[in-house]
């Protein structure tokens, strides 16, 4: 995990943050881990007025009303899709985590990243528009990898999946005879379904 992050020029920090970075490299889905002991209730909103916010890179930034933010109730804890804040940072003593795996609007993230002069690996991915179905897959992957490292850890709450606009389910129809003719072999229907 650490070797792969270093090959991709992503610095290693602590296990929980490293797992989110690893999954971003593996699946393309950015995630953010908040110290669960510092978070009561996650709220996603834009601020009513401008304010100063210190991001994880220890830089004080001016947040304007058109910047999408993540709040703990009314306290800002992250710039949505770009970078978290210092106040909810994962540290070595973190024993509880609130995991964010989201799908933020690419245009909004790009404008905020540009205005803040803060382009990150996460913002670069959000700018390209992500598959909303990857968010749950990324959360499940995080849990699996964490349990591989620490089998005693447990998921303390239900996973919440909120869609602003649900994508319609797509059905793909194809002719099995065409698949057999194209591949030159007879592939069982069950294997085709499993592969798809």
State where each predicted segment sits.
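RNA/tRNA-interacting regions in translation and RNA-turnover enzymes
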Residues: 4-7, 11-196
């Amino acid at each position: 995990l650490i070797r792969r992050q270093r090959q991709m020029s992503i610095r290693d920090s602590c296990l929980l943050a490293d797992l989110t970075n690893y999954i971003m490299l593996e699946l393309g889905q950015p995630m953010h881990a908040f110290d669960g002991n510092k978070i009561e209730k996650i709220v996603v909103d834009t601020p009513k007025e401008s304010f100063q916010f210190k991001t994880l890179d220890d830089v004080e930034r001016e947040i304007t009303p058109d910047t999408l933010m993540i709040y703990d109730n009314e306290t800002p804890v992250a710039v949505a899709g770009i970078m978290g804040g210092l106040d909810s940072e994962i540290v070595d003593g973190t024993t509880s985590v609130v995991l964010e795996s989201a799908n933020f609007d690419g245009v909004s993230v790009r404008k905020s990243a540009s205005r803040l002069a803060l382009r990150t690996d996460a913002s670069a991915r959000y700018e390209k528009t992500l598959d909303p179905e990857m968010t749950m897959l990324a959360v499940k992957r995080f849990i699996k990898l964490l349990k591989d490292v620490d089998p005693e850890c447990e998921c303390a709450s239900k996973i919440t999946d909120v869609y602003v606009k649900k994508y319609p389910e797509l059905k793909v129809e194809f002719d099995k005879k065409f698949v057999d003719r194209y591949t030159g072999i007879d592939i069982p229907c069950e294997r085709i379904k499993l592969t798809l």
